[in-house]
Amino acid sequence: MRPPWYPLHTPSLAFPLLFLLLSLLGGGARAEGREDPQLLVRVRGGQLRGIRLKAPGGPVSAFLGIPFAEPPVGSRRFMPPEPKRPWSGVLDATTFQNVCYQYVDTLYPGFEGTEMWNPNRELSEDCLYLNVWTPYPRPASPTPVLIWIYGGGFYSGAASLDVYDGRFLAQVEGAVLVSMNYRVGTFGFLALPGSREAPGNVGLLDQRLALQWVQENIAAFGGDPMSVTLFGESAGAASVGMHILSLPSRSLFHRAVLQSGTPNGPWATVSAGEARRRATLLARLVGCPPGGAGGNDTELIACLRTRPAQDLVDHEWHVLPQESIFRFSFVPVVDGDFLSDTPEALINTGDFQDLQVLVGVVKDEGSYFLVYGVPGFSKDNESLISRAQFLAGVRIGVPQASDLAAEAVVLHYTDWLHPEDPTHLRDAMSAVVGDHNVVCPVAQLAGRLAAQGARVYAYIFEHRASTLTWPLWMGVPHGYEIEFIFGLPLDPSLNYTTEERIFAQRLMKYWTNFARTGDPNDPRDSKSPQWPPYTTAAQQYVSLNLKPLEVRRGLRAQTCAFWNRFLPKLLSATDTLDEAERQWKAEFHRWSSYMVHWKNQFDHYSKQERCSDL
């Protein structure tokens, strides 16, 4: 899904001579940049030269591949980022730069549904670059800024993906849009908590450094540093939530949009102990420290820094504690620093009085993940599963569940009039994964933030794109609202329908209205249906589809009461039972061993001569 836009050129008979002259003067692109002051910007690090791009309705300015940190290579691997040192001359910012080193999805080679999320630039650990799109010419007055944080399970993703093209929002809505790369997987989230060599959460620190860069430099592009909105999807949305919960980040933005992800999701963080276990297991898998000896943190990290990046990526998935889906190997850690406590605790105790938040989900959050390991599922058939496959899928989809908790999930999601129906079982499995990992954490976050003083708006996205290549049974999968938010249907070459183009314009307006005012509604349009705030009492949210806005109440309220209220209590109770059972078994084992020992001693005693005389 790559929009076929190219830099604007003005045809001229004199162009070949002009090009030759400019080449002799030091390069056509550089000279063209000097001729157009709109494409030259000075930031704190030095001067940049951008590029003018076509977009529907007119051109935009793009400044691509701007370095905001020193390359995190060599001894900087696993370390917090360092700000980019100043450069001399004019830095070329006309093309995207490297993608951070990561796992590449090869499950369905050549299939657009997976390839659109795979890296589209060279993989490298030298990857900390950001991009800025602005209206052309530059805004005369400070313009609200939108900062995009991509998703990808904290193990993949890139700001340069075609689906994140910022030109449409910049041109149609007059927004200043920023996106950044951040380290993922082992390189961004391997943690030995308490260690200076690999403290963890450096991918989040990459994001924070980019936010600081925006505060220092965005005014030069026409952006308003006093009106910054973060928005992200999936792990990007979880990242946005973690910046909300991390005090040093809170002064760097003013509003937040969380699309299909939260910091309180069961996949979004791990404890310090689990992070250390995964890091040391990865080290052992790649032969660190050499010889298999114990070694301290410094020796372990020094060894890991010598290993090729691909070796680390190849072993990432082997550190997960059990077979699962929607679980990722290296993710943010509750480190006592970036995250001073668990996200749940911080959400419950935080003060969000001055915060405006937009949160939401898509209709079928779980379906995308089922083809990555749940028995019976594939993109190439209807995935009509048996009850046995459903039961096995629940254990993979809710990996932390005890036997009793898994049985409760099965009980809740089974259609007891048709308990063996393959279609229902398939759809129920999708709902289990989506509700558990996305929908109910979003509902919980919306309620808690609203209760703590934030102004919250909520949505469910229900439109399946006419161009979608995933099978019909997957519905509206995770991630497939993004193309509408970024305005890709406005590109006629991508073959969206007219209705989808109008729908995309509507969504772009909602998102940019929210970025400007903290309210997605247009204050100049009193005739259109209004999007009400989400409150703990009314729990109002809207459906986003080709129809007019519809207000609903209670986002999967009954089901989310199961996940957010009942199941945690059940898990807590069964944890106690499991511990009691473990202790009982240990005591029984000790007692049994004692009895065997006693019987052996008794038998030995009985065989002695004095006993035989009795």
Swiss-Prot record:
It is found in: Synapse; Secreted; Cell membrane. The active site is at residues 234, 365, 478. The keyword rRNA-binding does not apply. One of its GO terms (molecular function) is identical protein binding. Keywords: Cell membrane, Disulfide bond, Glycoprotein, GPI-anchor, Hydrolase, Lipoprotein, Membrane, Neurotransmitter degradation, Secreted, Serine esterase, Signal, Synapse. Disulfide bonds join 100-127, 288-303, 440-560. Its EC number is 3.1.1.7. GO terms for cellular component: basement membrane; cell surface; extracellular space; Golgi apparatus; neuromuscular junction; perinuclear region of cytoplasm; plasma membrane; side of membrane. PROSITE patterns: CARBOXYLESTERASE_B_1, CARBOXYLESTERASE_B_2. It is a peripheral membrane protein. Residues 1-31 form the signal peptide. Glycans are attached at residues 296, 381, 495. Predominates in most expressing tissues except erythrocytes where a glycophospholipid-attached form of ACHE predominates. CDD domains: Esterase_lipase. It catalyses: acetylcholine + H2O = choline + acetate + H(+). It is an enzyme of class 3 (hydrolase). One of its GO terms (biological process) is acetylcholine catabolic process. InterPro entries: AB_hydrolase_fold, AChE-related_enzymes, AChE_tetra, CarbesteraseB, Carboxylesterase_B_AS, Carboxylesterase_B_CS, Cholinesterase. It comes from the Eukaryota. Belongs to the type-B carboxylesterase/lipase family. PANTHER family: ACETYLCHOLINESTERASE. Isoform H generates GPI-anchored dimers; disulfide linked. Isoform T generates multiple structures, ranging from monomers and dimers to collagen-tailed and hydrophobic-tailed forms, in which catalytic tetramers are associated with anchoring proteins that attach them to the basal lamina or to cell membranes. In the collagen-tailed forms, isoform T subunits are associated with a specific collagen, COLQ, which triggers the formation of isoform T tetramers, from monomers and dimers. Interacts with PRIMA1. Synapses usually contain asymmetric molecules of cholinesterase, with a collagen-like part disulfide-bonded to the catalytic part. A different, globular type of cholinesterase occurs on the outer surfaces of cell membranes, including those of erythrocytes. Terminates signal transduction at the neuromuscular junction by rapid hydrolysis of the acetylcholine released into the synaptic cleft. This is Acetylcholinesterase. It comes from Mus musculus. The lineage of its organism: Eukaryota, Metazoa, Chordata, Craniata, Vertebrata. The gene is Ache.
